[in-house]
Each structure stands twice: as C-alpha cells, then as structure tokens.
Amino acid sequence: MEIAVVGTGEFILGFRLAGVRKTYAAETDERLVEHINQVLDDRDVGILVLKGSDMERIPLRLRTTLENSVKPTVIAIGGEEGGLSMRERIKRSVGVDLWK
C-alpha cells in the first residue's frame, strides 16, 4: 500500500522530501479533480492525503465519495474536515478503534 498526496506544489513538497513517491501537483480545480480520480483508480494507493481547504474545492459528489472511501482512506490535513474524524476513518478502515 502506498500513500498518495494531491495538492498545491507547496503542500506536496514536504511529502516528497519525506519519501512519498505518489505526489500530484494540482493548482487548478480541474487538475485537482483529475488527480483525485487518478488516485482513486490506482489499486496500489491505501491512503490519500489532501489539504482540508482542497476538500471544499471539489464537487459535492466526489467529496461524498472521498468521505465514504475505505480504500483509499482519505485524510484531509488542516482546516475544517467535513464528515468523519480521523479516529472514525481509521476505525472504519482497520475495523478496530485504536484509541481504546
């Protein structure tokens, strides 16, 4: 399982430096949606990381798909994350509440 990161060049830079290979720069809304769909189709990706503000930029239907996705598990960093907390996402993905 791999981690994929989609966002602005500044957002993905730190992930690249940390060794994440699947990083996709998306400066426009169209590129953001295109890269997210590309990651959703990639069976090797287990976690998709997005910036919280980018979640607000994508169409409602795709946002709902991401919020309900188990594989890949979608993590929005920073800002307000609509939907489930990280704890709930991990619980849904792994099947166990790791905080207990």
Curated annotation (Swiss-Prot):
It is found in: Cell membrane. Component of the A-type ATP synthase that produces ATP from ADP in the presence of a proton gradient across the membrane. The keyword Ion transport applies. Belongs to the V-ATPase F subunit family. This is A-type ATP synthase subunit F. GO terms for molecular function: ATP binding; proton-transporting ATP synthase activity, rotational mechanism; proton-transporting ATPase activity, rotational mechanism. It is a peripheral membrane protein. Its main location: membrane. Disulfide bonds: none annotated. One of its GO terms (cellular component) is plasma membrane. It comes from the Archaea. The lineage of its organism: Archaea, Methanobacteriati, Methanobacteriota, Stenosarchaea group, Methanomicrobia. Keywords: ATP synthesis, Cell membrane, Hydrogen ion transport, Ion transport, Membrane, Transport. One of its GO terms (biological process) is proton motive force-driven plasma membrane ATP synthesis. Has multiple subunits with at least A(3), B(3), C, D, E, F, H, I and proteolipid K(x). Pfam families: ATP-synt_F.
